[in-house]
Amino acid sequence: MKYEHWQIPAAPEDAIKTLMDAGYPYLVSSVLAARGVTTSEQAAEALEREKTLAYSPFLMKDMDKAVARISKALENGEKLAVFGDYDVDGITSTCLLTDYLRSRGADVTMHIPRRIEEGYGLGCDAIRALSESGVTLIVTVDCGITGVDETAYAATLGVDLVITDHHECKEQLPAAVAVVDPHRPDCPYPFKHLAGVGVALKLVLALGEGREDALFARYCTLAAIGTIADVMRMEGENRTIVQCGLESIDRSDFTGLHALLREAGLTSRPISSIQIGFVLAPRINAAGRMGRAELAAELLLTGDPVRAEKLARELCELNRERQSVEQDIFRRAIEQMEDLPESERSALVLSSEDWHQGVVGIVASRLSEKFSCPSFMIHLSGGSGKGSCRSYGGFNLFNALEACSDLLVSFGGHELAAGFTIEERNIPAFRTRMNQYVRAHTGEHPPVSMLDVDVDLQHPSLITLEEVEALSLLEPYGAGNNRPVFCLRGATLESVQGVGQNRHLKLKLQKSRVNFDGIFFSVTADECGVCAGMRVDAAFYLQVNEFRSQRSIQLQLIDLRPSLDPSGRENEALSLCRELISGGTLSPRDAARALPSRDQFVRAWRVLEREVGPDGVSEPMLPLLRHLSSEMVGAETFLRTAMCLQVFAERGLLSIERKDTTLTLRLTADGKKVELDKSPYLSALHGFLS
C-alpha cells in the first residue's frame, strides 16, 4: 500500500442523476459531481473550450518596455540572443521566441546553458561570450528573475537585458530594461500561473500585435508542451493554451515535433496531456538532464525531415540513458537515507559526488513520493554542491530555502520545486536546520500520505469502453484539474504477475462478475502485500489500451491494498499465512486460534496426498490454501492449513517454495512413519500456550 489513507467521498447521487439527465455520461457526471459541479450550467462552464486567451499581454508590468526595446533591435538590425533554460519549459520557450524573431528577419542566436558546466540561469561567462560575438540585447525566457549581479555585469559590457520569467521573485529585481514576470508584486496581470513558455508566448503576441490569432495558432502547441511539462495549474489561460495546443498538434508546422512523436510511439490520435507529460516531455527533458539541451532545441526548430528523424532517435536514446542513471542514483540515495538518524528524516538532505547533476531533481521527486517528505538532492563537485529539491504535501520550499539562505550561495524556484547552490561544508548545518524548519511547519509527525479518490465505482457494469473514452471531455489534466481517481472496493484479485523484468505488475480484477485488466508500474506483489485470490481495494486511473488495433479498458493502478470491507478477516488470515510460510512466527493469540488438532493434521495430509501427489503443485497462494482447506471450516483454516504445511515440511514430508505470490508444494515422504509431535516448531507452539 503506497498511501496511508484513502479519502473516498460519498457519491452525490442527486447531482450525478442531474448531470446524466442533461446528457453527460455516467463517469463524467460522477467525476464532475464529486468535484462540486451539480448543475448542467456548471458542467457546461467547467468543460468549456476557449479558443482565445483572456487577457492582453500589455497588462503585464514592463511588457510595453520589452516590446519597445526588442522592436528597436529589430529595426536597427541588432544581434539578439534568446537565453533560456535546459528543461522542457525553457527549451520550448527558447524555440518559440527564436522562431518568431527569425520570422521577423532578426539576427538571433540561442543560448541554453549546459546544466553541468554552467548551471541554471544567467551566467557572466555566457554573457561575456555573447557580447564578444556582437550581441547587444539578450532576452531571457524561463529564467533571469534572480540575475541581479549578472544583469549589472551585462550593463558594463553595453548589453541590454529584457527578462521574461515566471519564477518567484526576490525582494530585489534585476536592473534590466524590462522585467516581465507575473509574480512581480507590482504586476497587475490577473493570471499568475503561466509557465515560462506562457510568458514567452505573451511576449510574441505583444510583438505581433494585430496578428494575435495567427501567432497563437502557430505557437500554442509548443506552449502547451512546456506548460504541461512544468506542471502548471491547469486552469485559466493555461487550460486554453493546452486545449488549443493539443487540438492543433497534427497541424503544427514544426517538423521535429512530428518526428519525435513518431519515435516515441505516439501515433494514435488524439494526443492527451498525459501522453505529453509522461512520454513526450521526458524525452525533451532528457536532453537537458544529460547536458545536451541544444539537441532538443535543434530538433524543434529544424525543417529538415531527415535531420529531424536522426535527432528524435538521439533524444529517445538519451532518455533511456537517463532512466538507467536515475534508477542507480535512486537506489544509492535510499541506501544513504537508511543511515540517517530519525531526527534527520523529516526532510531528506542527501549528497554525493557520484550523482549526475542532471538527474538529481527527478530522483528527489521519487524520494518525496516514497517517503512522504521534502527531499533535497545535492551533486557535489570541488567542495561545492548544486541541489534540486521537491516538496511534499504542499510544503513551501521557496520559503524554507529563504529561511536557510545564510547557508546557501544562491537559490530560486517555486513553492513545490526549487534549486540551490551550497558549499559542501555547510551541508550538515543545512540538513539540521531544514529538518527543524520542516518539523516546525508541519509538526513532529510528517503529513499522512493521502490519496484523494474522486469516484467509488459501485456499479462496475457501467464501466464501458465508450464511458472511458468520454473521460477525455475532462481534459486537459494537470494541477487544479487532476486526472480523476477511481476505486473498486472488495474486488477479487484473480491473478497477478510480474512484467518488465518484474519491475511492474500485471493483474486481473473481478467485481460483480465484471473483469478488468490492470497494470501497476514500479511495484512488486510483495510491496503491495497482496496475492491472487485476495479481496482487495484498488485505486486507479481509467484508460483505453490499444494493442494490435484492439481497444480495451485498462486500469492504471495507483494503489492496491487488502480489502478493508467486512470480508477482510480472510485477508488477515492470509497475511499471517504468508508470514508463517516465509519462516516467521505467530503471536500466542494467533497460534491458539489456529493450532491444528491431530485429526486435522490427518485430514490435511489426506488432502495433500490426493491433490498434490509426487509431481507437486504450483499455484497462487490463496486459491491453493482454499483448496487444501476444503475439509475445514472458517477463515482461520487458511492459517491452520499453513501450520500443517510448515510442520510437514519440517519433518521431511513436504517441500515448500514461495516465490512472490506463488506457492509450490511437493511430497517428499518415503513411506516411513514420522512423529509430528517431535517437530521443533510444534513443540515451540505448545510451549507458547502452556
Where are these regions (language model features)?
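Generic enzyme active-site microenvironment
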Residues: 83, 140, 163-165, 228, ...
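Generic detector of well-ordered alpha-helical packing
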Residues: 86-90, 143, 166-167, 182, ...
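Acidic, two-metal ion nucleic-acid-processing modules in DNA metabolism proteins
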Residues: 97, 102, 239-282, 286-334, ...
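Histidine-centered active-site/metal-ligand motif
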Residues: 166-167, 356, 414, 504
